UniProtKB/Swiss-Prot annotation:
Residues 10-19 have a biased composition (Polar residues). Coiled coil: none annotated. It comes from Ehrlichia canis (strain Jake). GO terms for cellular component: cytosolic large ribosomal subunit. This is Large ribosomal subunit protein bL28. The gene is rpmB. GO terms for molecular function: structural constituent of ribosome. InterPro entries: Ribosomal_bL28, Ribosomal_bL28/bL31-like_sf, Ribosomal_bL28_bact-type, Ribosomal_bL28_sf.
Length: 100
């Protein structure tokens, strides 16, 4: 299992551990991932994801999973999230109401 966010693709990053004497040693920073089920109100479906805490906070801030997908550019999303975004866009085009 890779430690990558299923929505944004955010993975581990690299940096330095700096000691008191200012010596630097390489280290990795892992992403804080959670297994969550997100509900799409427009599609009336549930989706299971492995999502980072940062992405969860952003989804709450944007007003829900559907609004997050609609208001986020496709190049910031993974392929899996882009497919769901396309489904949501098609449902909105057919006349399903988007509630805030």
């Amino acid at each position: 299992m890779s430690r990558v966010c299923d929505i944004t693709g955010q993975g581990k990053s690299f940096g330095n551990k700096v000691s008191h004497s200012n010596r630097k040693t390489k280290r990795t920073y892992l992403v804080n991932l959670h297994n969550v089920t997100l509900l799409s109100d427009i599609l009336n479906r549930k989706f299971k994801f492995k999502v980072s805490s940062r992405t969860l906070r952003t989804i709450d801030y944007k007003g829900g999973f559907d609004l997050y997908l609609l208001n986020t550019s496709s190049r910031k999303l993974t392929d899996k999230a882009q497919k769901i975004k396309k489904l949501v866009k098609n449902a909105v085009a057919k006349g399903v109401k988007v509630s805030l």
